[in-house]
Every structure is written in C-alpha cells, then in structure tokens.
Amino acid sequence: MKALRNYLDKIKPNFEEGGKLHAFRSVFDGFETFLFVPNSTSKTGVHIHDAIDSKRIMSMVVIALIPALLFGMYNVGYQHFLAVGQEAGFFEKFIYGFLAVLPKIIVSYVVGLGIEFVVAQWKNEEIQEGFLVSGLLIPMIVPVECPLWILAVATAFSVIFAKEVFGGTGMNIFNPALITRAFLFFAYPTKMSGDAVWVSTDSIFGIGGGQVVDGFTGATMLGQAATAAPGASELINVNGTPATMWDMVVGLIPGSIGETSVIAIALGAIILLWTGVASWKTMFSVFAGGIAVSYTHLRAHETLMNL
C-alpha cells in the first residue's frame, strides 16, 4: 500500500490546479479517497466527529451484501440445473450463476458510475460514493432473465431522476435501487413478473442448457401462493417436486438474484449491526411496520374495519 500511496502522490500534481490533467481532478480525488482516508478537514462546524468517512461506510455495506450476492449466484445455477434436469456439482452451479450475474453488475456500475463521473466533472465536484452500494443492489433485486439493455435504461433513470436532480448522495429522497425496480416493474412488467423471468434456462459459454423437465414451473413461492386454488397447501420447486420450508429459509427457490436466502441476508444484517453501520431500531421498525400492515390486511374483510 505504501508503494501505491507514493505513486498517487507522484501523479497527483497533474490533477491539481494548473496540471495537464486538471479536468479529471474529480475522478482522481474519488479514486484516491476510495483507497485511502482523505487528509482534508472540515471548514465549518460538523454534527459528528469520527475517524470513518462515507466511503468506508459504503464499503462496509458492500461487504455485508456479499453473502447474499454469492449465494444468489449459486442459486441461479442451482435453479438452472434443476430446471433442465441435469446433474452438476457445486462449482459448476456457481460458475453458471456467476457468468449470468456478472454482466448485470458490470452494466449497473458502468452506467451508474459513468453518469456520476459526468455529473461530477460538470459540477467540478468530487465523485460521490453512494453508488458503490446502489450499483451492487440493483442487479441483486432483479430477475436473472432481465435484459441488460433494460437494466441499463432503468439504472440511468434512477441515477438521474432519483439522485442527481436532488443534489446527489445524502440529498436524494428516494432510494435509487428501489426506484430502479419500480421503473422496471411499471415500464417493463413482463420482464419483472410472471413465470418466465426467474429461472435461466439457456446455456452460457457452453455450460448448462437443454430441454426443461416435465412439470417445470418458474413461478416464485409467493406467485404460487397468490394463484393457488382454494385449499391448496403445497408449493413446488421448478422441477415439480414439493418445496420444503428449509428450501425457503436457505433460499433454494426462484426469485430475484439476491432476495431468496434468509440466512445470507441475516448474515449481512449481523455484519452491519456488528460494525455499527446499521441500527437495530431501524431494522426492527421495518419488521414491525410490515407485521402491522399485514395484520390490518388480514382483518380488512371484517365489517367493523370498513366503518
């Protein structure tokens, strides 16, 4: 790291006032502060004094997302080989999922960070760090079969209209990742819902592929529950076999890339709580609000609830 620090110090004058690369100063500053703690100090009063900066916080959130991301990659491969009825080892399933998910991560970061680079240059400001998290969240909350060009359009829309128009990181009133999903759902509903978007059945670089098994269904567990006939109590996997509660807890079910595993998501939550990045009160409030609304919905048919 010392050698890298010395190299950055050597080329830094080129990006300062009067340097031949001054036009790209915001890009250099963003890269430098991502690698090292900035040596700048506040010019006015601040609310909190701490040794950690925003980039370190965002980096910790990215680390917390890794368990769900890695499991999501494995599950993409698992669902694929289950659908085509082929035997495959852990490594082959993971590689298939990795190759299916990686392009979405690349598109998300290239489009989102590209827009942020342009805005930073235009406003002559340092590149903001918020998209470090959003760029990873966006591909994790979409189906594996979501086309790359649609993902690029949705990412651009969310970065511009849900973030930059409000002033950037810390000033936006909407979450860019959630706006991306909302945009996709309303603009391209057939790419975000139904039975055909959650499981990849194509071959990737010669890995996998083939005819799907008889009884194949790509519906999610919630989708099956919503459309089940009255009295039906059994949910099924993509190959037609009954799904167990353990499958749902572990996350071996169809769904968005990073949403299926309760265990992986809980591990990420533990990381955030342990590092002090997240508050247990905020997490508890989310579940409390969800339970309260669900209870209200269950009682909505009662006459007294409609007075």
Residue ranges and their predicted role:
Residues 2-101, 105:
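N-terminal signal-anchor module of multipass membrane proteins
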Residues 130-201:
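A generic, well-ordered mixed alpha/beta core segment in the N-terminal half of proteins
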Residues 296-303:
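Conserved small/polar residues in nucleotide/adenosyl-binding loops
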